């Protein structure tokens, strides 16, 4: 995730994955990767509740294993949940068999039909198998809240610059992203609402 918007060539290589939803609707889809963790995820949930916004959480299996109550709390509050592998494994760096085992092990804990590969990195063969089991959800806008080179103001500016109808927007409920995300998320929601955007969770298909 080195760019705010994924390059056209990469999107063309994986056309059957979901990069954007309902392009004609004035709706955006907030997503949160890498949780759940007790230091950050509850704050995100409370913030979303305060603004009446539903979102989608792509969870790492190891975190769910440690904090199963947070998985249940996310769903209880009306958000959707997706699989983000068991150990935040990057598909481009490992063989298909090993990668699929990691994903399926995570899904024993998460139980979702949505999947997002960490860093958006996936081999074509991995994608082919996973498409038969999951809707693969990529993204239209990466806020880069995790970047130590960006300030919270710059993360917010990424949202303002790149958000559009149907955008799937990536934040992170992680310690690495916490400072920037906590600055940018409420301000991004307020700005998007001012621009007339609605919010929705990605349904677990």
PLM feature spans:
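Catalytic grooves of carbohydrate-active enzymes
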Residues: 159-203
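N-terminal pre-catalytic segment of deacetylase/amide-hydrolase enzymes
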Residues: 1-31, 36-51, 66-67, 187-205
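Charged catalytic carboxylate motif
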Residues: 43, 102, 184
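Metal-dependent polysaccharide deacetylase catalytic core of the NodB/CE4 family, i.e.
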Residues: 27-28, 38, 47-154, 159-177
């Amino acid at each position: 995730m080195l760019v705010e918007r994924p390059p056209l060539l990469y999107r063309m290589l994986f056309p059957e994955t979901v990069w954007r939803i309902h392009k004609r609707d004035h709706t955006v889809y907030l997503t949160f990767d890498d949780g759940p963790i007790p230091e950050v995820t509850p704050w995100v949930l409370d913030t979303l509740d305060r603004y009446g916004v539903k979102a989608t959480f792509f969870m790492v299996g190891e975190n769910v294993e440690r904090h199963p109550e947070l998985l249940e709390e996310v769903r209880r509050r009306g958000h959707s949940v997706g699989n983000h592998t068991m150990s935040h494994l990057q598909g481009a760096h490992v063989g298909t068999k090993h990668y699929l085992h990691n994903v399926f092990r995570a899904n024993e804990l998460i139980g979702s039909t949505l999947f997002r590969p960490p860093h958006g990195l996936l081999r074509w063969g991995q994608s082919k198998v996973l498409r038969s089991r999951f809707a693969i959800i990529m993204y239209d806008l990466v806020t880069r809240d995790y970047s130590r080179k960006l300030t919270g103001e710059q993360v917010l500016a990424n949202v303002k610059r790149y958000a559009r109808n149907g955008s799937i927007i990536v934040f992170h409920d992680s310690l690495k992203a916490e400072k920037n995300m906590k600055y940018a998320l409420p301000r991004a929601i307020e700005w998007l609402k001012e621009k007339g955007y609605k919010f929705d969770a990605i349904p677990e298909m």
